[in-house]
A protein has these predicted regions:
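Bacterial N-terminal signal peptides
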Residues: 5-15
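Short, flexible active-site loop motifs that bind/organize anionic cofactors or intermediates
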Residues: 10, 19, 75
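Cleaved targeting-peptide boundary
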Residues: 19-28
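A cross-family detector of function-defining hotspots
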Residues: 28-130, 135-137
Length: 138
């Protein structure tokens, strides 16, 4: 019975950890975001990886093996729906909440813990939601 309980807990932990998000490492994002389309080492030492899964493209920037910025696009270049934006923000909430700032051409969001911000607008010619870590002041 004890082994069965441990097995159930392991399965539940795996199922609940199925979503990747800001701050996660290569392995979790590789598993969650699908096929790697492109990987580039950038001049600043970060690594940019483009993933493709289902109808989405995920552009992720890694620093020190952790995701510090993620952009979410539709493969066809169409706009993300409000429901999709809400779902992606929720996945990157880290236990905090998001507040929206409406601007003329670009929508922006701030996380209540001050550790992340997001914008919805044009990235490389496509509509995208970009979530990025906000670095603390030294």
């Amino acid at each position: 019975m004890k082994k069965f309980s441990i097995l159930i807990l392991a399965i539940l932990a795996t199922v609940t950890c199925g979503w990747a998000n800001l701050g996660d490492g290569y392995e979790k994002l590789d598993d969650s975001y699908g096929n790697i389309v492109q990987r580039k080492l950038r001049d600043d030492g970060t690594v940019s990886v483009l993933y493709h899964k289902d109808r989405y493209l995920y552009q992720v920037t890694f620093a020190d093996g952790r995701s510090v910025s993620e952009s979410y696009f539709h493969v066809k270049g169409t706009d993300l729906s409000e429901k999709e934006i809400t779902k992606l923000l929720k996945a990157n909430a880290g236990g905090a909440t998001w507040t929206s700032n409406q601007e003329a051409k670009k929508r922006s969001f701030k996380r209540s813990d001050g550790k992340a911000e997001a914008t919805y607008g044009n990235v490389n010619g496509r509509s995208a939601l970009t979530v990025r870590e906000v670095l603390g002041k030294p």
